[in-house]
Regions:
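Short loop/turn motifs that initiate or flank beta-strands
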Residues: 1-193
Length: 193
């Protein structure tokens, strides 16, 4: 009863997205940077169909922390994982994410030795040195106190005493990224001529 005409259609086959397993990020000590080192020794694609040949290449894989600051469970975004093999054109790659920790770095703040003459001004807040700051960070000031007794005129007593630093603040550093150790210096007060 019919004269049938058949018309063609189009089949579009999209590449399948592969996920990646076996990639982890190493914890690190704070260095002021977001770069992460990765463990890729067991990296593998998940989702390859049947006997398709698709190999993973992690030679250019990189990891980036979401934040450079100290923290736990910080997201690490992975990039640069590539594919090869006879059937690789049938697939795309979903780059993985993982997490890792950044722990505080040791920072030593040392009071500089000071020599004064009886009647000189106070110790100030800038005579100190530091070891451990990262990425050109700076400390603005440090509280410096002495265990020297004070005379009735509020001048340090002649002799030697300890300068104790504390409360590093300011500058460009963030104190929560460091485990701070304070080391003392020596105050020498000479008699006034």
């Amino acid at each position: 009863n019919y004269s049938v005409t058949y018309a063609t259609g189009t089949l579009t086959v999209n590449a399948k997205a592969l996920t990646v397993s076996g990639v982890t990020a190493n914890n690190k000590v704070y260095d002021g940077l977001t770069t992460s080192t990765l463990n890729t020794g067991t990296a593998a694609f998940v989702g390859v169909v049947g006997a398709d040949v698709v190999t993973i290449n992690v030679a250019s894989a990189t990891g980036t922390f979401a934040s450079a600051n100290v923290g736990t469970g910080i997201t690490v975004t992975v990039a640069g994982i590539a594919k090869a093999g006879a059937d690789n054109a049938n697939y795309t790659i979903t780059q993985p994410t993982t997490t890792a920790n950044i722990t505080a770095r040791g920072l030593t703040v040392t009071a500089s030795n000071q020599t004064k003459t009886y009647g000189d001004s106070a110790l100030g807040t800038s005579l100190f040195t530091s070891v451990g700051l990262q990425n050109s960070e700076t400390i603005g000031s440090v509280t410096l106190t002495s265990n020297s007794a004070l005379s009735t005129s509020s001048n340090y007593i002649v002799g030697s005493s300890t300068i104790t630093p504390s409360a590093a603040i300011g500058g460009t550093f963030t104190i929560t990224n460091y485990s701070v150790t304070y080391a003392t210096g020596t105050l020498t007060v000479n008699a006034k001529a």
